[in-house]
Amino acid sequence: MQFSKMHGLGNDFMVVDAVTQNVFFSPDMIRRLADRHQGVGFDQLLVVEPPYDPDLDFHYRIFNADGSEVAQCGNGARCFARFVRLKGLTNKREIRVSTANGRMVLTVNEDEQVRVNMGEPVFEPSLVPFRANKAEKTYIMRAAEQTVLCGVVSMGNPHCVIQVDDVATAPVETLGPLMESHERFPERANIGFMQVMNTEHIRLRVFERGAGETQACGSGACGAVAVGIQQGLLAAQVRVDLPGGRLDIAWKGPGNPLFMTGPATHVYDGFIHL
């Protein structure tokens, strides 16, 4: 099986063309491939499949390193767009794909940065999903004897956003896993730790569901900005600095889609016997 190794700001992926190759991945096989010592090593596996709908170009599947399939990965979407062009699967700059829970439009700019229409952020708790009696801008939660104030949003996957004074000292490794698997998130959640620098600039670290802390989380950056705008902390265009680099997020508010722009890097091509 041929594959490519790619990354978006250090969030790394094994990308596989299932349009011209016959492939099947069991959860156990994905876990073995994800092993950084005995496999290829990656945060997520991205699979390019033929479209299910004639109006679309491809179907986009995402698997975490633990073998679980998820519906959204923003950094992966940028790599997906670069991959299908690099491999000659399309020459379009505007690429329409379906995912497990919807559709996305990926635009490859002239400078090879990729702009992703992430759809409209969803704050309704039952749709995140998040257990709450009603929608709030800020929720009060309890985790390991401490009170946590957070915002909750879905960007096609669930995000919990916690504002902190300094991301460098944020309790990502301790509070992250507790919140990820909190009983109020029936499908678990990605946990963002957000430091607001000013209305147009945040710093962010993300403990990703099923992957742990990563160098960057595209949907996490989108979720953090959406929550920040909803809470009145941020403007409509925001620079997000993650450990792996910078993303630019734009959202005009309710009724509008959110856009993420950032890089996608091809590292190498490989061949593996399964």
Curated annotation (Swiss-Prot):
Q: What InterPro entries does UniProt report for this protein, alphabetically?
A: DAP_epimerase_AS, DAP_epimerase_DapF
Q: Which reaction does it catalyse?
A: (2S,6S)-2,6-diaminopimelate = meso-2,6-diaminopimelate
Q: In which pathway does it act?
A: Amino-acid biosynthesis; L-lysine biosynthesis via DAP pathway; DL-2,6-diaminopimelate from LL-2,6-diaminopimelate: step 1/1
Active site positions: 73 (proton donor), 217 (proton acceptor)
The domain of life for this entry's organism is Bacteria
Q: Which Pfam families match?
A: DAP_epimerase
Write down the EC number: 5.1.1.7
Q: Name one GO biological process term.
A: lysine biosynthetic process via diaminopimelate
Coiled-coil residue windows: none
**GO MF terms, alphabetically ordered:** diaminopimelate epimerase activity
Kindly list the residues the record flags as site (Could be important to modulate the pK values of the two catalytic cysteine residues): 159, 208
**Residues annotated for substrate binding in this entry:** 11, 44, 64, 74-75, 157, 190, 208-209, 218-219
Which parts of the sequence are marked as the site Important for dimerization? 268
Quote the cellular component terms of the Gene Ontology held in the record: cytosol
The question of whether ATP-binding is a record keyword is answered with no
Gene3D superfamilies found in the cross-reference section = Diaminopimelate Epimerase, Chain A, domain 1
Key words, A-Z: Amino-acid biosynthesis, Cytoplasm, Isomerase, Lysine biosynthesis
**Compartments reported by the entry:** Cytoplasm
Q: Which PANTHER family did the record assign?
A: DIAMINOPIMELATE EPIMERASE (PTHR31689:SF0), DIAMINOPIMELATE EPIMERASE, CHLOROPLASTIC (PTHR31689)
| Summary of subunit composition and partner proteins | Homodimer.
Which family does this protein fall into?
Answer: Belongs to the diaminopimelate epimerase family.
What role is this protein assigned? Answer: Catalyzes the stereoinversion of LL-2,6-diaminopimelate (L,L-DAP) to meso-diaminopimelate (meso-DAP), a precursor of L-lysine and an essential component of the bacterial peptidoglycan.
**Protein name per its UniProtKB record:** Diaminopimelate epimerase
Species, as recorded: Cronobacter sakazakii (strain ATCC BAA-894)
At the highest ranks, the source species' classification is: Bacteria, Pseudomonadati, Pseudomonadota, Gammaproteobacteria, Enterobacterales
